[in-house]
């Protein structure tokens, strides 16, 4: 694996599979927050300590394959340009917070299933991504990496509290489980706000596709746990999975309701969005996300034949500003991005139809 491949292949290998409930659930993510006993928290550490953590991982973990993930590549943020960092964020391989740090780094597995972020809010944040609803499988992989690291270093751990983390809400298991979910039915039936309120009352958090402070572009929401203290990893996963399954049921019910009561209007909306994607010469990222969401819904409901749902997922990633500019070989102005985005979508849909 090389930096060029990571940058030039917009679709991570894990995105190409279809997991359970993939018509509604795009991905499952597990993140484990860990800190080393001998170092200050990342928020307080100096440059020397940050470099020591880089060297520790370079010495003990780079070029040492872990089955079934293969070898890991070390990417230091201060060795990447702003565009490269943005691409990693848009591929969900690092957090926006890590992209903005000077001494952060990331270890990526060959499949990009596993991302180990260094010197973010915590010394180590292990992230594991799976397609569809596969929280338990993602947790199993994350725990395997966690054990691999803990064989070489000593974590900050308290017998009564659990893992010590920079943010109090992560103290305990240090586990943040999240699911990326496509909910156009609930948005169109105007039930989404009520659903979000119920989710929040259950102690879960609803965010946009890039986490805290981001928008829910294309009717895609991220649902995650909030507190970890006093609960086991298995309980956190079970609770989140139960809520997600209820949301899936509500989304399917909403879709059925729209088809029964507003079938022609929905079909018109789907095909109008398809027409925009297939014919536009300029399209902004927000409009593209909305149209892609409509067309994906049309595919799921059988209105549109001959186009793979995965193509829509691919285009949602490919049309992000950073990845567009990476493909172009450098920075683009807003109108240039809109032109290239529209061209890319038209060409990709044309290839799919042929």
UniProtKB/Swiss-Prot annotation:
Pfam families: ATP-gua_Ptrans. Keywords: Allosteric enzyme, ATP-binding, Kinase, Nucleotide-binding, Transferase. Belongs to the ATP:guanido phosphotransferase family. It is an enzyme of class 2 (transferase). GO terms for molecular function: ATP binding; creatine kinase activity; protein kinase activity. This is Protein-arginine kinase. Catalyzes the specific phosphorylation of arginine residues in a large number of proteins. Is part of the bacterial stress response system. Protein arginine phosphorylation has a physiologically important role and is involved in the regulation of many critical cellular processes, such as protein homeostasis, motility, competence, and stringent and stress responses, by regulating gene expression and protein activity. Its EC number is 2.7.14.1. InterPro entries: Arg_Kinase, ATP-guanido_PTrfase, ATP-guanido_PTrfase_AS, ATP-guanido_PTrfase_cat, Gln_synth/guanido_kin_cat_dom. SUPFAM superfamilies: Glutamine synthetase/guanido kinase. GO terms for biological process: phosphocreatine biosynthetic process. ATP binds at residues 27-31, 92, 125, 176-180, 207-212. One of its GO terms (cellular component) is extracellular space. A motif (RDXXRA motif of the pArg binding pocket involved in allosteric regulation) lies at residues 337-342. It catalyses: L-arginyl-[protein] + ATP = N(omega)-phospho-L-arginyl-[protein] + ADP + H(+). Residues 24-254 form the Phosphagen kinase C-terminal domain. It comes from the Bacteria. Appears to be allosterically activated by the binding of pArg-containing polypeptides to the pArg-binding pocket localized in the C-terminal domain of McsB.
């Amino acid at each position: 694996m090389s930096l060029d491949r990571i940058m030039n292949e917009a679709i991570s290998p894990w995105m190409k599979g279809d997991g359970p409930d993939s018509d509604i659930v795009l991905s499952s993510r597990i993140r484990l927050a860990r800190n080393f006993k001998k170092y200050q928290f990342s928020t307080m550490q100096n440059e020397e300590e940050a470099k020591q953590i880089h060297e520790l991982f370079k010495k003990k973990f780079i070029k040492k394959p872990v089955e079934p993930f293969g070898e890991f590549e070390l990417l230091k943020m201060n060795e990447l340009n702003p565009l490269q960092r943005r691409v990693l964020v848009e591929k969900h391989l690092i957090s926006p917070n890590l992209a903005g740090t000077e001494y952060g780094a990331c270890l990526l597995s060959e499949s990009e299933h596993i991302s180990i972020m260094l010197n973010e809010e915590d010394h180590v944040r292990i992230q594991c991504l799976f397609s569809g609803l596969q929280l338990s499988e993602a947790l199993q992989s994350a725990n395997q990496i966690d054990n691999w690291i803990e064989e070489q270093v000593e974590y900050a751990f308290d017998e009564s509290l659990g893992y010590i983390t920079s943010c109090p809400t992560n103290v305990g298991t240090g586990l943040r489980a999240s699911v990326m979910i496509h909910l156009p039915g609930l948005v169109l039936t105007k039930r989404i706000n009520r659903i979000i309120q119920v989710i929040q009352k259950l102690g879960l958090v609803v965010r946009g596709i890039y986490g805290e402070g981001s928008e829910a572009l294309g009717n895609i929401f991220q649902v995650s746990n909030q507190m970890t203290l006093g609960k086991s990893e298995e309980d956190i996963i079970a609770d989140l999975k139960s809520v997600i399954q209820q949301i899936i049921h509500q989304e399917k019910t909403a879709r059925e309701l729209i088809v029964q009561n507003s079938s022609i209007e929905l079909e018109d909306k789907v095909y109008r969005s398809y027409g925009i994607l297939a014919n536009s010469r300029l399209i902004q990222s927000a409009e593209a996300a909305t149209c892609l969401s409509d067309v994906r819904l049309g595919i799921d409901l059988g209105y549109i034949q001959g186009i793979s749902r995965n193509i829509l997922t691919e285009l949602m990633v490919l049309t992000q500003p950073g990845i567009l500019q990476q493909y172009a070989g450098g920075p683009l102005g807003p109108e240039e991005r809109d032109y290239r985005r529209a061209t890319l979508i038209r060409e990709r849909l044309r290839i799919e139809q042929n």
